[in-house]
């Protein structure tokens, strides 16, 4: 029986990766720039919080959304993914934020795909054939409500011909949540039908998840532990995006949990209704389309990985395909900012992955590499490429300085030392003594 499961390494789609000079005019992902902005390039940032890894910020019910809101007010364009922006029945529209599914974000970072901002998508809805009638009706009412009250372009829905049979578990090696669907073919057939019948170019999927015992989700409701649903949600959306190259996001269907008075605010968004679908439909309605990086995508003014100026991610979650691609890019390398306060169950720190990180904090940090024990003597401070910060307050401050063309170290006491002299290497076949003689003859000292 065919199954879909989450792997660390995923097969790449054979796409054209022709490189082109980045001299074209950048497209805006929000309102037209004012006259004062015409003389500068737009600043683009990427915010990543991996799914199902117990992130201190972003590991619950949309609790990274305030960070995205604050960051979007500083940058011209913010690229992030559903785990950051989805908050069940809550959402926050931000005109300069691009809602990009995780698999697509990885391909974008690797330079394989480009992002094409849109005014509107045609959204289709896939409902798991295993959803009970009453629960299905409630989700259809959500779709109608978003169409009538928000004007969202949700065109048609389809029910899978076979129940998907979602399974979820925690990976014993990494501690992150993951899972599979037993009948991936049923999901792909449903999506293909919507694409061919209704010409949709974005898909929301609602899978029937097993109802948890209260004991299994008690830690999560108290604001600790991991999201048991998130890992397999990523499996589902990855499958659709990999197969059809269109925006996709998932919303689980479950019966409401019993009421509890002792609830962490970070988990509360998932307790206020029968559905997680509103934020998904809202995000997909204007999610960018995914195009292979080629001459056509360049002519359409799409965003490329080389357009990204900075990337923000948790301090010990740096091993994802997208994070590594950005950190190891050879051309137009973005500023990588890791946030110490946002811990996960992973142990993928920059130093373990060979990602050179500058220490921006003035206190002891357990993630600080040994060779960066002193802020003032760090040799990398003259050319900032990766920065470790204490929290998202500092991250946003660093990005504001970076966007303004200001060395962030100039904002700290003793952050700037004396300028250092660079010595040229002797040319091949010419001794240092000969070079000195030539300089003296030319009158240059």
How does the language model describe each region?
Residues 94-103, 263-284, 353-364, 383:
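Acidic, Ser/Thr-rich peripheral helices and adjacent loops at domain boundaries
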Residues 154-157, 248, 336, 357:
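Conserved beta-strand scaffold positions in the cores of enzyme catalytic domains, especially
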Residues 2-205, 211-219, 225-230, 432-443:
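Metallocofactor- and cofactor-centric catalytic cores in central/energy metabolism, strongly enriched
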Residues 166-329, 335-337:
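Long alpha-helical, hydrophobic tracts
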Residues 256-257, 282-310, 314-445:
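C-terminal functional extensions of proteins
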Residues 79-88, 112-119, 159-164, 238-245, ...:
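Low-complexity, flexible helical/coil segments
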Residues 159, 253, 341:
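Residues that form or immediately flank small-molecule/cofactor binding pockets and catalytic motifs
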